Structure formats: structure tokens, C-alpha cells
Amino acid sequence: MSQSVASKLSPPRAARLAVATMFFVAGAVQGNWVVRIPDVQQALGLSAGALGVALFGLPLGLLVGVPLSGWASVRWGSRSVTIVAALGTCATLTLPPLAGSGATLLAALVLFGIASGSLDVAMNTQAVAVEARYERPIMSSFHAVFSGGGLAGSAVGGAVAALGVGP
């Protein structure tokens, strides 16, 4: 890992905050998507079965993104991959509402899965580097921040949906 957090940032607190921010963003994006699934289903007029098929795109993307991220992290450093994957995850979250059919929703979710799977691996690799600098277990704090992000993303997504804003 040529560009790990441990080698690029001096103060461990700054590195911890940076990685925690990525965990929060990842959780918020996931939380926001989950609460908008019914709206996307309704907008596309998908049956429960058709939605289930389309949702299969997310784990398909994860199957690609997870190993891709590991390879990319070795080649370019997990810090760089984390940044690119976070931007990609946020960008691909905009695709499901733009889908015009179950097939395009599936394709959008494959891309979302690739990006979010890549982010998951890269940010956890960064978290391991930060944890090593602390010389004590702190990994659970990153995962707690992910959960907090999920809560925040769900709350915002739910509030926006309640206001009648389309997916």
C-alpha cells in the first residue's frame, strides 16, 4: 500500500477522522438508497418479483467491486481507491432513480454495487492502517460511524420522501 493513511497523515487523529468520514458517507448512501426503494419500485411500476430481480444487481456489483478494490489498492494505494470509490458510490446513487425499467435499474445497481464494494474494501483497509497507528482496537468505532451514517441517510431519505420529492 503505497499511499496508506498511516504514511500520508502524521496525526493519527486526522487519519481517524478522515477514515471515519468515509464510513459515515458509505452508511449514509446505503441508508438513503434503502428508504427510497419503494419509491423507485412505484415509479417504474415494478412487481415485487421484478424488483427482486433488479435488486440482484447490487450483490452482482459487489462481487466485481470487492476483488477489484483489493487489486486497485495494491496498485494505487487504498487511500486513492477510497477517495475514488467514495465519489463513485455517491455518483452511482443517482442512477437508480434515473432508471426507466427493471433492466436499467439492475444495470444501475450493478454499477452502484461495484462502487460501494470498492469503497467497503478500501476504507476498511484504511481503517486497519489507522488502527495499527493507535496500537489498540478502534475498528468497531468506524463501524459504529457507518451505522450512524446509515441512520442519518435513512432519516434524510425518509424525510425527503415524506415531502413528496421523487426518488
How would you name each of these model-derived features?
Residues R79-T89:
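Primarily marks hydrophobic transmembrane alpha-helices of the MFS/SLC 12-helix fold
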Residues P97-A108:
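Helix-loop junctions at membrane interfaces in 12-TM secondary transporters
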Residues G31, L58-P67, G150-L151:
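Residue-level signature of mid-helix packing/kink "hotspots" within the transmembrane helices
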Residues F142, F146-P167:
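Helix-loop-helix hairpin linking two adjacent transmembrane segments in secondary transporters
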Residues K8-P38, Q42, V110-L111:
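Pair of pore-lining "gating" transmembrane helices in MFS-fold secondary transporters
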Residues A15, I37, L46-L55, M139:
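Juxtamembrane helix-start elements in MFS-like secondary transporters
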Residues L63-S78, A161:
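Helix-to-loop junctions at the C-terminal end of transmembrane segments
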Residues L109-A144:
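Cytoplasmic helix-loop-helix junction between adjacent transmembrane helices
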